[in-house]
């Protein structure tokens, strides 16, 4: 096994190390009037969400998996006063604060926080206007007056517990993503500092995509099927131009992959990422949401003579996967058993969003009873977790985890 700090050459190899984010005060800054702006449909109850998340983390530890936390890694990356100051300035610049006085007040507030992890968690939680000195009306600009009812000086980042999306581990490399929405793109700042300054990861990991790019890609659309084959989704959150940039970098940097299967499917919120409708659970088994199958287009992408070669695949999906994975047959396990009502309900509650921690061993929400029963009938071992509050953010076990190390398969 390589000593490289990032080692992810499959979706199913035994998981050794994973990064999570424990939901924090950012969830308490969700308001009904601004849910759409922050990409939420409902407001989780923080206390119960934390209990559910702690149980998820413990279930992973019980399987011998080392659990890292985004907030701790980011804090450990602020290794000098200069780097800490730089982090605060970048955070302020990306918060799009229009008023100079407000920016000065927030800078003072953040510099007043001496503990690095407390600082990181405060940047995640957002900053309410009531936390700052009040600006007299005569000193306010037009934007301040028009948006006087908006409660935040800096928006919270409530999606952070979905650590799968801001960056993705691919082989020994990382795709540091440019995300679909401004409210989530700020999340990638933490990954930037981890992979630039962290004592273990800083400067030791190649980037195959950079957050400075102007086209969008998210980790839920990046799946590592084997040491030779990747799958990427062309979705609501990831566009084809980003995928082409990613693939050119992967092939040029010799990260180790020979082919990419690009999945184009319905562009809407309920199917926001490939991993909300399609995940690998064993050497020869995948979960899939049946609603995407009719409109699914798959393209094979290779790199020849220093350019991408793209071929649309016309055959059966299971046969295509079997051929590319070198197995005799692939089983597609349909969410909800293919029943239109059960499939729609359980996909919405992330029945297709499984986290595989070893071949045939998956973490799932306990609430998706129809899909879970079928998975067990296929011989999989299920580690069931509660997700009544966590699921309100529209993400499951895979969404909530970013593997840093897997065993080879």
From Swiss-Prot:
Belongs to the arginine deiminase family. GO terms for molecular function: arginine deiminase activity. It holds the Pfam family ADI. Pathway: Amino-acid degradation; L-arginine degradation via ADI pathway; carbamoyl phosphate from L-arginine: step 1/2. GO terms for cellular component: cytoplasm. Its EC number is 3.5.3.6. The lineage of its organism: Bacteria, Bacillati, Bacillota, Bacilli, Lactobacillales. It comes from Streptococcus pneumoniae (strain CGSP14). PANTHER family: ARGININE DEIMINASE (PTHR47271:SF2). One of its GO terms (biological process) is arginine catabolic process to ornithine. This is Arginine deiminase. It catalyses: L-arginine + H2O = L-citrulline + NH4(+).
